[in-house]
């Protein structure tokens, strides 16, 4: 029987492998730095968030093993803007090829466009209670924290260029330095071609010429100048920059997405062979895809952001999504919120009630998953919970005094004992989901003449004085018009819920309100 490592999750397995590797390398394990790179050029999405959340999870497992850890959240805000993300102001077009830290924030709330984008991701991490040490590329380069690594890399640029061509077939760095200078005259970086490294003065000579950036031709200004590698006048290319950071920040773990696998392979080689620094332990994860199977992109409009998700779901639902597994591509949309919310509810019930399906290993893994979804913060007991899908359906019915009326139904159903702040919070989230996701025009309903006649009679009945036996009355109306009661009930559910079935129709109409239902029916006649 295979021994359970830690809490039985992939997170624990990775942390265990990391420590074993560090011991084999003879390095101290008193403090382990894990890193996540934050893109600063596009709108941060759930995939961007997942990189940092997973790294933090590995850190938590390290802490569980008795090792101190720190998550370094590194914003690549010296990167240049290659294209304007969908939905962003077109005025950003004039800043194409400029470092995102040098572009004004179009919304005026941060010191730069890059910091605005990074701030959105940090806001998501804060909402999840993820602790991190935030660092900016602009400050890192400006303060010369990578200068020794840059010197070592540029001094070996010919060797690196040959290796890049050998490993991934990219010829570019055989003839140019793996360094992007920022033109001192026009402020653009991808037009400033680095042509020579002067090791004695530690400066990069460049000339600013026309270049293709983000699929478009961008004009250079013709300026020739020098960039000091000890400042923020340029940055290393991705193919080598990770290695510089890993050594400068003593990074021992970094996960990466499948899309940058080649860059990581090259950086591992640069770290090991050029900088003589053993590369970090890695974990490769698959990307989140949109519901059409396309990669979620920072610059396109198919982005599910942490902010959008948290309008409908709890932080625990996001953490569960990230910690369930690390392998396998997954399609992700806001329509997945209900399933994750209910899955967390199931884990909570199993955790405190005991039992569960799948044997001891599966039970241990599920317990561990619940604990990581709460960032290993011990839970005193189960929080009040109700099935999210039920909350959504009830929220669709009750807009006025929603929390009170939905809670009343939950008590009647025996789901909860009474009102509580937690249930009110869940109703608020489910209510947002109901209001936003079902706001589109409802589907058409085909009604024959007999059904229309029965519905008209029901409208008259609902407008009269309330009486007992509404369920039987509806049944009788259907029969009197020659409509099978089952078909009549289905038509009513379609009108009220836009679904083919629902709760017992008579009490259901009384719950919603006779006048309101009558109005719904009139709108379909």
Curated annotation (Swiss-Prot):
What is the reaction catalyzed?
tRNA(Lys) + L-lysine + ATP = L-lysyl-tRNA(Lys) + AMP + diphosphate
Q: What is its EC number?
A: 6.1.1.6
Q: Name one GO cellular component term.
A: cytoplasm
What GO terms describe the biological role, i.e. biological process, of this protein?
lysyl-tRNA aminoacylation
Task: Report the Pfam families cross-referenced here.
Answer: tRNA-synt_1f (PF01921)
Q: Where is this motif: 'HIGH' region?
A: 40-48
Q: Does this entry carry the keyword Ligase?
A: yes
Q: What protein family is recorded?
A: Belongs to the class-I aminoacyl-tRNA synthetase family.
Q: What is this protein called?
A: Lysine--tRNA ligase
Upper classification of the organism: Archaea, Nitrososphaerota, Candidatus Cenarchaeales, Candidatus Cenarchaeaceae, Candidatus Cenarchaeum
